[in-house]
Curated annotation (Swiss-Prot):
Glycans are attached at P42, P43, P45, P49, P50, P149, P150, P152. It comes from Nicotiana tabacum (Common tobacco). Residues 1-18 form the signal peptide. It is found in: Secreted. Expressed in leaves. Induction: By methyl jasmonate in leaves. O-glycosylated; contains pentose side chains. This is Hydroxyproline-rich systemin B. Activates a lipid-based signal transduction pathway in which linolenic acid is converted to jasmonic acid, a potent activator of defense gene transcription, including proteinase inhibitors.
Length: 164
């Protein structure tokens, strides 16, 4: 029971990972904005940061400053993602997306499960995990003689009390 609970605890975060991978594969959650898909049109020029071609007499508005900050945030996020891709070059394989997602899930799922399984099998409660095909332990259990009740012995050298 404890082993099943540990496996459930390990698997629960990866349901969201697999759901996200599926959405990204279908193009539902791809984009630089929060939940912005690939099917949406690009942002309008009014919301983009002011270009250098605009005269310097026009001061940028407050929304333009926020947009440029958001753009910088997105660019730093993309740069961080590229750095992680350099660490694990096989995670982003454009020619075979399913293989890349399988490798990513195997690293994030199979390694922790095998580690926890080693802990369970080497721990002190491995007697709970009985081999179902091992009949020798069953024979020892069912063929065991019942314990006989303890024989009445005198306590501390005194005679046992007799019932009248």
């Amino acid at each position: 029971m404890r082993a099943l609970f540990l496996i459930y605890l390990i698997l629960s975060p990866f349901r969201a990972v697999s759901r996200t991978l599926l959405e990204n594969h279908e193009g539902l959650n791809v984009g630089s904005g929060y939940g912005r898909g690939t099917n949406l049109p690009p942002p309008s020029p009014a919301s983009s940061p002011p270009s250098k071609e605009v005269s310097n007499s026009v001061s940028p508005t407050r929304t333009d400053e926020k947009t440029s900050e958001n753009t910088e945030l997105v660019m730093t996020t993309i740069a961080q993602g590229e750095n992680s891709n350099q660490l694990f070059p096989f995670l982003t394989s454009s020619d075979n997306y399913q293989l890349a997602s399988f490798k990513k899930l195997s690293i994030s799922y199979l390694l922790p499960v095998s580690y926890v399984w080693k802990l369970i099998s080497s721990s002190s409660f491995n007697h709970d995990l009985v081999d179902i095909f091992d009949t020798s332990s069953d024979e020892k259990y069912w063929n065991r003689k019942p314990l006989s009740p303890p024989s009445p012995k005198p306590a501390d050298g005194h005679r046992p009390l007799q019932s009248y």
